[in-house]
Amino acid sequence: MGRYSREPDVASKTCKARGSNLRVHFKNTRETAMAIKKMSLRRAQAFLKNVTDHKECVPFRRFNGGVGRCSQAKQWGTTQGRWPKKSAEFLLQMLRNAESNADYSGLDVDRLVIEHIQVNRAPCLRRRTYRAHGRINPYMSSPCHIEMWLTEAESGVDGAKQGKKKKKTDGVEKATTKRQKQ
């Protein structure tokens, strides 16, 4: 299966989904994909449904020229955001595909996390629009290829991360108490 840009580390605990030459804007889809990366499957599905309902926005970080500001982008630490409905619907359909692949493979669907998601440009499709004085201008579309894989999250990893955070906060508290004593 050489159609993916890279292969997962543990193939037995991974489910994949991909789409080629999808008629959805590349830039919007890239920003939406980066927003759901590292999310759990259920959270990503809820997020994409909220985007279509304008309850949560997609932060625009790279392709943000001319993008307006919205208050919903504050939760992402940025000011610019949009609600790309068609991109959200395409990614939601791909997540459903990956979920059915995971169910077929016997993976625990509730523990799936989006480990890898990548959006590439597909060849542009050319149409024409008619202008004044007999001129014709191109009317291009920017389709994209999307690939993703989801892996089962291990509960031990989450506990290890929380343990590290506690140690850091303990160190900060100790430092503040030493300063207060001096």
Swiss-Prot record:
The answer to whether keyword tRNA-binding applies is no
**A Pfam family it matches:** Ribosomal_L22
| PROSITE patterns in alphabetical order | RIBOSOMAL_L22 (PS00464)
* Keyword vocabulary terms for this entry: Ribonucleoprotein, Ribosomal protein
Q: Does the keyword Ribonucleoprotein apply?
A: yes
Q: Which GO terms describe its biological process?
A: cytoplasmic translation
Its GO CC terms? cytosolic large ribosomal subunit
Gene Ontology molecular function, alphabetical:
structural constituent of ribosome
**Disordered as annotated region, ranges:** 155-182
Q: Where is the signal peptide?
A: none
For this protein, the record's PANTHER family field holds: 60S RIBOSOMAL PROTEIN L17
Q: Which protein family is named in the record?
A: Belongs to the universal ribosomal protein uL22 family.
Q: What is this protein called?
A: Large ribosomal subunit protein uL22
Organism encoding this protein: Carabus granulatus (Ground beetle)
